[in-house]
Amino acid sequence: MKEKKYILFIVMLLMNTFTSIAQNDFDLTQRWFNETLYNPASAGNNFSTGVFLHSRLQWVGVSGAPSTHAGTFDTYVEELRSGFGLTFAADKLGSMSNYNIRLAYAFYIPIGQKSVLSLGLSGGILSRNRRLQANDSESTIDPSWAYGNVSDYSSDFDLGFEFKGPFKLGASVRHLASQPVQYNLTKHSMSIWTYLSSRFNISESLSLEPMAAVLYTESSYRAELGAIFYFLKTESKSTYSDKFWLGALYRTGNSFAVLAGMNLTSKIRLGYSFDYAIGDLSSIAKAGTHELFLSFYLNRIFYKDEVCPAYREHIRRR
């Protein structure tokens, strides 16, 4: 009951801050492995130090199609019950290039021995460059800049929460105070992303993680539904690791994706996904979308019966 009250309060707080929203952000299929890119409350949620790198080539073969390169560094400090993160992203769509760098902070509140609620905030700089073409002379940005480059930047802030226990539930409100310095290039309306997943063992060597998410955009929304099977390797009576995983993901009216990956070592893992466009895009994006991610953990151990590190520190301070 106490856990439900915490979650309900945070959800209501975030919903009340979200008014008008628009599609502005880069998209990654494998963000399920690195929520910190979209939610500051996820910084340090693996209770270790890690580096994540993503590279995405969308609609291969289509001129001006989007491409994205992104990454995070995050760590958890048990004495502070806090996670810290640094995220960056560079994506390109046609004549538009976007660059974003942020610092993220998350504070962890233990709820029992194996559940934790984190509250996060991130802030940074959003930069956008547009190479104007002849057909941009009527641009609402500034017609005098036609046939040239226009650059702009703004400060940017995100707010989020994440509950991690028998299931994972999170939400983030993005672009809380995004105002362009000179032009209208970097002005972002607020957007919100909510997600839910739960992982459970089917056998000693196999586990399943169903997941769902909703991304709200201006006057519409997009849902994601998927599942990932993890094939496990037992290290000892108390620890295990993922040997490899296979999964599938469906985005309503947008695409269908397959995901696969493996642990190259106990600290390094590699993942790949392929998105096949459906609906109106299927006729022009026949080659699909390819995405790779690489992660490196300095000190992560997977426990079968893990006690939350935030709870351990909470007990120590009593």
List each language-model region with its residue ranges.
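Positively charged n-region of N-terminal signal peptides that target proteins for export
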Residues: M1-Y6, I111-Q113
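Sec-dependent N-terminal signal peptides
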Residues: Y6-N16
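Subset of outer-membrane beta-barrel
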Residues: Q23-R318
